[in-house]
Protein backbone atom coordinates (compact mmCIF):
# COMPACT_ATOMS: atom_id res chain seq x y z
CA UNK A 1 0.00 0.00 0.00
CA UNK A 2 1.41 3.38 -1.00
CA UNK A 3 2.26 5.84 1.75
CA UNK A 4 -0.31 8.62 2.04
CA UNK A 5 0.32 12.18 1.00
CA UNK A 6 1.35 14.15 4.09
CA UNK A 7 -0.26 17.58 4.58
CA UNK A 8 1.90 20.59 5.44
CA UNK A 9 0.46 23.83 6.84
CA UNK A 10 2.75 26.84 6.59
CA UNK A 11 2.42 30.60 6.89
CA UNK A 12 4.56 33.55 7.93
CA UNK A 13 5.32 34.08 11.61
CA UNK A 14 2.27 35.51 13.44
CA UNK A 15 -0.17 34.64 10.63
CA UNK A 16 -2.18 32.28 12.84
CA UNK A 17 -1.05 28.86 11.63
CA UNK A 18 -0.79 27.38 15.14
CA UNK A 19 -4.39 28.28 15.99
CA UNK A 20 -5.65 26.84 12.70
CA UNK A 21 -3.55 23.70 13.09
CA UNK A 22 -4.86 23.10 16.61
CA UNK A 23 -8.45 23.58 15.52
CA UNK A 24 -8.14 21.14 12.63
CA UNK A 25 -6.13 18.65 14.67
CA UNK A 26 -8.84 18.48 17.32
CA UNK A 27 -11.57 18.17 14.72
CA UNK A 28 -9.88 15.50 12.59
CA UNK A 29 -7.82 13.66 15.19
CA UNK A 30 -4.47 14.74 13.73
CA UNK A 31 -1.03 14.74 15.34
CA UNK A 32 1.13 17.81 14.76
CA UNK A 33 4.75 17.53 13.62
CA UNK A 34 6.41 20.89 14.23
CA UNK A 35 8.73 22.38 11.60
CA UNK A 36 10.36 25.21 13.50
CA UNK A 37 14.08 25.73 13.98
CA UNK A 38 13.72 27.08 17.52
CA UNK A 39 10.78 25.31 19.16
CA UNK A 40 13.02 22.23 19.09
CA UNK A 41 14.93 23.81 22.00
CA UNK A 42 13.83 23.22 25.57
CA UNK A 43 13.27 26.50 27.38
CA UNK A 44 12.64 28.66 24.32
CA UNK A 45 8.92 29.00 24.95
CA UNK A 46 7.62 32.57 25.03
CA UNK A 47 9.91 33.95 22.36
CA UNK A 48 9.07 31.16 19.93
CA UNK A 49 5.33 31.17 20.66
CA UNK A 50 5.63 27.47 21.41
CA UNK A 51 2.26 25.74 21.96
CA UNK A 52 1.28 25.89 25.62
CA UNK A 53 1.16 22.83 27.90
CA UNK A 54 -2.64 22.97 27.67
CA UNK A 55 -2.55 22.99 23.86
CA UNK A 56 -0.05 20.15 23.81
CA UNK A 57 -2.22 18.16 26.20
CA UNK A 58 -5.21 18.49 23.85
CA UNK A 59 -3.33 17.56 20.66
CA UNK A 60 -0.26 15.28 20.35
CA UNK A 61 2.80 17.26 19.22
CA UNK A 62 6.13 16.00 17.90
CA UNK A 63 9.53 17.70 17.48
CA UNK A 64 9.07 20.17 20.33
CA UNK A 65 11.61 20.35 23.18
CA UNK A 66 13.91 17.73 21.67
CA UNK A 67 17.29 19.33 22.44
CA UNK A 68 18.90 21.47 25.13
CA UNK A 69 19.83 25.06 24.28
CA UNK A 70 23.50 24.24 24.90
CA UNK A 71 23.49 21.56 22.19
CA UNK A 72 23.78 21.86 18.43
CA UNK A 73 20.96 20.73 16.16
CA UNK A 74 20.88 20.69 12.38
CA UNK A 75 18.50 20.11 9.52
CA UNK A 76 19.65 16.52 8.99
CA UNK A 77 18.76 15.67 12.60
CA UNK A 78 15.41 17.37 12.17
CA UNK A 79 14.57 15.51 8.97
CA UNK A 80 15.45 12.14 10.48
CA UNK A 81 13.41 12.76 13.63
CA UNK A 82 10.44 14.25 11.79
CA UNK A 83 10.31 11.33 9.37
CA UNK A 84 10.52 8.87 12.27
CA UNK A 85 7.61 10.68 13.94
CA UNK A 86 5.56 10.49 10.75
CA UNK A 87 6.24 6.76 10.44
CA UNK A 88 5.14 6.26 14.04
CA UNK A 89 1.95 8.32 13.61
CA UNK A 90 0.95 6.46 10.45
CA UNK A 91 1.69 3.09 12.06
CA UNK A 92 -0.86 3.92 14.75
CA UNK A 93 -3.51 4.68 12.16
CA UNK A 94 -3.37 8.44 12.65
CA UNK A 95 -2.61 11.25 10.22
CA UNK A 96 0.24 13.72 10.77
CA UNK A 97 0.01 17.42 9.98
CA UNK A 98 3.37 19.13 9.52
CA UNK A 99 3.10 22.70 10.82
CA UNK A 100 5.74 25.41 10.76
CA UNK A 101 7.44 28.28 9.03
CA UNK A 102 11.10 27.24 8.86
CA UNK A 103 11.62 26.87 5.14
CA UNK A 104 14.88 24.95 5.44
CA UNK A 105 13.16 22.25 7.50
CA UNK A 106 10.16 22.04 5.19
CA UNK A 107 12.41 21.77 2.14
CA UNK A 108 14.44 18.99 3.78
CA UNK A 109 11.25 16.98 4.28
CA UNK A 110 9.58 17.65 0.95
CA UNK A 111 12.63 17.73 -1.32
CA UNK A 112 15.13 15.63 0.60
CA UNK A 113 18.55 16.58 1.97
CA UNK A 114 21.26 17.97 -0.35
CA UNK A 115 23.86 15.39 -1.36
CA UNK A 116 26.73 17.62 -0.26
CA UNK A 117 30.27 16.56 0.71
CA UNK A 118 31.12 16.18 4.41
CA UNK A 119 32.24 19.19 6.42
CA UNK A 120 35.88 20.27 6.43
CA UNK A 121 36.70 21.53 9.96
CA UNK A 122 39.66 23.66 8.81
CA UNK A 123 37.68 25.31 6.03
CA UNK A 124 34.75 25.82 8.40
CA UNK A 125 36.98 27.51 11.00
CA UNK A 126 38.52 29.79 8.37
CA UNK A 127 35.10 30.83 7.10
CA UNK A 128 33.81 31.49 10.60
CA UNK A 129 36.79 33.79 11.14
CA UNK A 130 36.04 35.45 7.81
CA UNK A 131 32.43 35.93 8.88
CA UNK A 132 33.58 37.82 11.95
CA UNK A 133 36.01 39.94 9.95
CA UNK A 134 33.94 40.75 6.85
CA UNK A 135 30.40 40.41 8.18
CA UNK A 136 27.35 38.44 7.07
CA UNK A 137 26.37 40.84 4.27
CA UNK A 138 29.73 40.50 2.53
CA UNK A 139 29.57 36.70 2.55
CA UNK A 140 25.96 36.74 1.39
CA UNK A 141 26.92 39.05 -1.46
CA UNK A 142 29.52 36.51 -2.58
CA UNK A 143 26.84 33.83 -2.75
CA UNK A 144 24.37 36.20 -4.43
CA UNK A 145 26.86 37.01 -7.17
CA UNK A 146 27.46 33.35 -7.96
CA UNK A 147 23.96 31.95 -7.40
CA UNK A 148 21.04 34.22 -6.44
CA UNK A 149 18.73 31.26 -5.78
CA UNK A 150 21.20 29.82 -3.30
CA UNK A 151 21.47 33.19 -1.56
CA UNK A 152 17.69 33.26 -1.13
CA UNK A 153 17.83 29.86 0.57
CA UNK A 154 20.17 31.20 3.26
CA UNK A 155 17.49 33.28 5.07
CA UNK A 156 20.41 35.37 6.44
CA UNK A 157 21.37 32.44 8.67
CA UNK A 158 25.13 32.65 9.41
CA UNK A 159 25.52 28.88 9.80
CA UNK A 160 23.93 28.24 6.41
CA UNK A 161 26.04 30.94 4.78
CA UNK A 162 29.24 29.46 6.20
CA UNK A 163 28.24 25.95 5.12
CA UNK A 164 27.29 27.10 1.62
CA UNK A 165 30.64 28.83 1.11
CA UNK A 166 32.51 25.90 2.64
CA UNK A 167 30.99 23.58 0.05
CA UNK A 168 31.39 26.09 -2.79
CA UNK A 169 35.06 26.78 -2.15
CA UNK A 170 35.83 23.09 -1.80
CA UNK A 171 33.78 21.73 -4.69
CA UNK A 172 32.89 24.69 -6.91
CA UNK A 173 29.18 24.15 -6.37
CA UNK A 174 26.68 25.24 -3.74
CA UNK A 175 24.70 22.74 -1.63
CA UNK A 176 21.55 23.29 -3.68
CA UNK A 177 23.40 22.29 -6.87
CA UNK A 178 24.27 18.77 -5.72
CA UNK A 179 20.84 17.26 -6.05
CA UNK A 180 18.90 15.74 -3.20
CA UNK A 181 18.36 12.41 -1.53
CA UNK A 182 14.86 11.09 -2.21
CA UNK A 183 12.34 12.27 0.40
CA UNK A 184 10.79 9.58 2.57
CA UNK A 185 7.26 10.86 1.87
CA UNK A 186 5.36 13.02 -0.56
CA UNK A 187 3.82 16.20 0.82
CA UNK A 188 0.96 18.53 -0.05
CA UNK A 189 1.72 22.10 1.04
CA UNK A 190 -1.06 24.44 2.16
CA UNK A 191 0.30 27.97 2.53
CA UNK A 192 -1.52 31.12 3.53
CA UNK A 193 -1.02 34.70 4.59
CA UNK A 194 -3.50 37.34 5.77
CA UNK A 195 -3.59 40.74 4.00
CA UNK A 196 -0.59 42.98 4.68
CA UNK A 197 -2.42 45.39 6.99
CA UNK A 198 -3.78 42.53 9.08
CA UNK A 199 -0.35 40.90 9.24
CA UNK A 200 1.20 44.13 10.48
CA UNK A 201 -1.38 44.37 13.26
CA UNK A 202 -1.00 40.71 14.19
CA UNK A 203 2.78 41.03 14.41
CA UNK A 204 2.56 44.16 16.56
CA UNK A 205 0.01 42.69 18.97
CA UNK A 206 1.81 39.35 19.21
CA UNK A 207 5.16 40.99 19.92
CA UNK A 208 3.71 43.23 22.63
CA UNK A 209 1.93 40.29 24.29
CA UNK A 210 5.06 38.11 24.28
CA UNK A 211 7.17 40.85 25.84
CA UNK A 212 4.57 41.47 28.55
CA UNK A 213 4.33 37.74 29.25
CA UNK A 214 7.99 37.51 30.29
CA UNK A 215 10.10 37.20 27.15
CA UNK A 216 12.87 39.43 28.60
CA UNK A 217 13.18 37.09 31.59
CA UNK A 218 13.34 34.09 29.26
CA UNK A 219 16.12 35.79 27.30
CA UNK A 220 17.98 36.52 30.54
CA UNK A 221 17.74 32.82 31.44
CA UNK A 222 19.04 31.89 27.97
CA UNK A 223 22.03 34.20 28.37
CA UNK A 224 22.90 32.33 31.55
CA UNK A 225 22.86 29.04 29.64
CA UNK A 226 24.50 30.18 26.40
CA UNK A 227 26.38 33.52 26.45
CA UNK A 228 25.29 35.50 23.37
CA UNK A 229 28.78 36.90 22.82
CA UNK A 230 30.24 33.45 22.03
CA UNK A 231 31.92 33.10 18.63
CA UNK A 232 30.66 31.82 16.32
CA UNK A 233 27.29 33.17 17.35
CA UNK A 234 25.26 30.38 18.99
CA UNK A 235 22.32 29.11 16.98
CA UNK A 236 19.80 29.86 19.72
CA UNK A 237 20.73 33.55 19.62
CA UNK A 238 19.73 33.69 15.95
CA UNK A 239 16.09 33.32 17.01
CA UNK A 240 14.06 36.43 16.26
CA UNK A 241 13.80 38.92 19.08
CA UNK A 242 15.92 37.28 21.77
CA UNK A 243 18.72 39.84 21.53
CA UNK A 244 16.23 42.69 21.94
CA UNK A 245 14.42 40.92 24.78
CA UNK A 246 17.76 40.46 26.55
CA UNK A 247 18.52 44.15 26.09
CA UNK A 248 15.23 44.94 27.86
CA UNK A 249 16.12 42.60 30.73
CA UNK A 250 19.51 44.28 31.09
CA UNK A 251 18.10 47.81 30.94
CA UNK A 252 19.74 48.64 27.62
CA UNK A 253 16.50 48.98 25.65
CA UNK A 254 13.00 50.12 26.52
CA UNK A 255 10.03 47.80 26.18
CA UNK A 256 8.59 50.06 23.49
CA UNK A 257 11.89 50.11 21.62
CA UNK A 258 12.14 46.33 21.71
CA UNK A 259 8.57 45.97 20.53
CA UNK A 260 9.19 48.14 17.48
CA UNK A 261 12.51 46.48 16.60
CA UNK A 262 11.16 42.94 16.96
CA UNK A 263 7.98 43.72 15.03
CA UNK A 264 10.03 45.17 12.16
CA UNK A 265 12.35 42.14 12.07
CA UNK A 266 9.35 39.80 12.17
CA UNK A 267 7.68 41.53 9.23
CA UNK A 268 10.92 41.37 7.24
CA UNK A 269 11.31 37.69 8.07
CA UNK A 270 7.71 37.07 7.05
CA UNK A 271 8.44 38.45 3.59
CA UNK A 272 11.39 36.06 3.26
CA UNK A 273 9.17 33.19 4.39
CA UNK A 274 6.64 33.99 1.66
CA UNK A 275 9.40 34.06 -0.95
CA UNK A 276 10.65 30.66 0.25
CA UNK A 277 7.15 29.16 0.15
CA UNK A 278 6.70 30.19 -3.46
CA UNK A 279 10.20 29.54 -4.80
CA UNK A 280 11.46 26.60 -2.78
CA UNK A 281 8.25 24.78 -1.85
CA UNK A 282 6.35 25.64 -5.02
CA UNK A 283 3.35 26.60 -2.91
CA UNK A 284 0.46 28.85 -3.85
CA UNK A 285 0.03 31.30 -0.98
CA UNK A 286 -3.71 31.65 -0.39
CA UNK A 287 -5.96 33.59 1.95
CA UNK A 288 -6.45 31.96 5.38
CA UNK A 289 -10.03 30.97 4.52
CA UNK A 290 -9.08 29.47 1.16
CA UNK A 291 -6.16 27.51 2.60
CA UNK A 292 -8.37 26.17 5.40
CA UNK A 293 -11.05 25.12 2.92
CA UNK A 294 -8.53 23.32 0.72
CA UNK A 295 -6.91 21.61 3.70
CA UNK A 296 -10.30 20.49 5.01
CA UNK A 297 -11.15 19.04 1.61
CA UNK A 298 -7.81 17.21 1.60
CA UNK A 299 -8.49 15.78 5.07
CA UNK A 300 -11.97 14.65 4.05
CA UNK A 301 -10.54 12.87 1.01
CA UNK A 302 -7.82 11.27 3.13
CA UNK A 303 -10.42 9.69 5.37
CA UNK A 304 -9.37 11.57 8.51
CA UNK A 305 -12.20 11.25 11.06
CA UNK A 306 -14.16 14.41 11.80
Curated annotation (Swiss-Prot):
Source organism superkingdom: Bacteria
Keywords in alphabetical order: ATP-binding, Magnesium, Nucleotide-binding, Transferase, tRNA processing
Pfam families recorded: IPPT
GO biological process: tRNA modification
First-tier enzyme category under EC: transferase
SUPFAM superfamilies (alphabetical): P-loop containing nucleoside triphosphate hydrolases
Record-listed substrate binding positions: 13-18
EC id: 2.5.1.75
Coiled-coil regions, chain positions: none
Feature type site, description Interaction with substrate tRNA: 102, 124
KW Nucleotide-binding (keyword) present: yes
Binding residues annotated for ATP, in chain numbering: 11-18
Gene3D superfamilies referenced in this protein's UniProt entry, alphabetically: 1.10.20.140, P-loop containing nucleotide triphosphate hydrolases
Entries under InterPro entries matching the protein: Dimethylallyltransferase, IPT, P-loop_NTPase
Gene Ontology terms for molecular function: ATP binding; tRNA dimethylallyltransferase activity
This protein's record includes keyword ATP-binding: yes
Cofactor: Mg(2+)
Quaternary structure annotation from Swiss-Prot or TrEMBL: Monomer.
PANTHER family: TRNA DIMETHYLALLYLTRANSFERASE
NCBIfam families: miaA
Function: Catalyzes the transfer of a dimethylallyl group onto the adenine at position 37 in tRNAs that read codons beginning with uridine, leading to the formation of N6-(dimethylallyl)adenosine (i(6)A).
Family per record: Belongs to the IPP transferase family.
Protein name (Swiss-Prot/TrEMBL): tRNA dimethylallyltransferase
The organism of origin for this protein: Deinococcus radiodurans (strain ATCC 13939 / DSM 20539 / JCM 16871 / CCUG 27074 / LMG 4051 / NBRC 15346 / NCIMB 9279 / VKM B-1422 / R1)
Name of the coding gene: miaA
Amino acid sequence: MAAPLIPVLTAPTAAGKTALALRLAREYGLEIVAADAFTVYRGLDLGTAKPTPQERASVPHHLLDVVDVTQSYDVAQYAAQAEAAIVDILARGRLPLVVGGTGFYLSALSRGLPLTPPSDPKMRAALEAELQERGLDALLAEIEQANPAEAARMERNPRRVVRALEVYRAAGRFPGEFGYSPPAFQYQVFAFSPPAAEMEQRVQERTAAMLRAGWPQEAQWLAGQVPPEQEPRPTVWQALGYAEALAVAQGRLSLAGAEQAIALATRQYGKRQLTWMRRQLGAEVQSPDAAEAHLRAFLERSGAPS
